[in-house]
Amino acid sequence: MMKCLFLLCLCLLPIVVFSSTFTSQNLIDLPSESPVPKPVLDTNGKELNPNSSYRIISIGRGALGGDVYLGKSPNSDAPCPDGVFRYNSDVGPSGTPVRFIPLSTNIFEDQLLNIQFNIPTVKLCVSYTIWKVGNLNAHLRTMLLETGGTIGQADSSYFKIVKSSKFGYNLLYCPITRHFLCPFCRDDNFCAKVGVVIQNGKRRLALVNENPLDVLFQEV
């Protein structure tokens, strides 16, 4: 009898060991679902369309408001307007229309894209409609947004639209290769916030460490 019990235990031992090993070390990891990208919406709640034009509107009121526009940079020798500015008040003129050029077919939050002022212009000034980030401005101690970029250029012309922590959206500058050229790109994704600085009495879009510009997008 004892011999039969002993043989039975020997038969069951591999099953117990296999079961323990499988459950503790070889659990099957099911693939997790990727988050569904969220489309960026305009002021009417419609998804942004790469073929449409929009005004970038600051959410603030009074001196905190004002649309984004294309203007001449102070002391610039460029043959065309080459600066990205914000009007000094929400009761000022309407901003310059822009279009968003995504890497994919749609415009989603937290996705790389180019931004271009969508206005009639002479051939000489076509490249002066595409947004980019300039070199470090020693006087203002920041990097200013300007035009003269190239669609698809990774190091100076890529931006993202992300949800603001307050209301509306924020713009981010996100170079994807030479991060060392952007001392303001400090977050996990090597992006920098876009805000406003004062340059010669005008409000100029620039990279900031805090207080990013909260904006909405109004279809033209």
Curated annotation (Swiss-Prot):
Entry's family note: Belongs to the protease inhibitor I3 (leguminous Kunitz-type inhibitor) family.
Propeptide positions: 24-32
Main localization, broad class: other
Keyword Glycosyltransferase found: no
Pfam families: Kunitz_legume
Protein's UniProt keywords contain Glycoprotein: yes
Record's function text: Inhibitor of cathepsin D (aspartic protease). May also inhibit trypsin and chymotrypsin (serine proteases). Protects the plant by inhibiting proteases of invading organisms.
Gene3D superfamilies tied to this protein: 2.80.10.50
GO CC, any one term: vacuole
Annotated protein name in UniProt: Aspartic protease inhibitor 5
Alphabetically ordered keywords of this record: Aspartic protease inhibitor, Disulfide bond, Glycoprotein, Protease inhibitor, Serine protease inhibitor, Signal, Vacuole
Glycan-linked positions: 51
Annotated site residues (Reactive bond for chymotrypsin) in this chain: 143-144
Signal peptide: 1-23
Cysteine-cysteine disulfides: 80-125, 174-185
InterPro entries the UniProt entry points to: Kunitz_inhibitor_STI-like_sf, Prot_inh_Kunz-lg
Segments carrying motif Vacuolar targeting signal: 26-31
Site feature (Reactive bond for trypsin) residues: 99-100
Location in or out of the cell: Vacuole
SMART domains assigned: STI (SM00452)
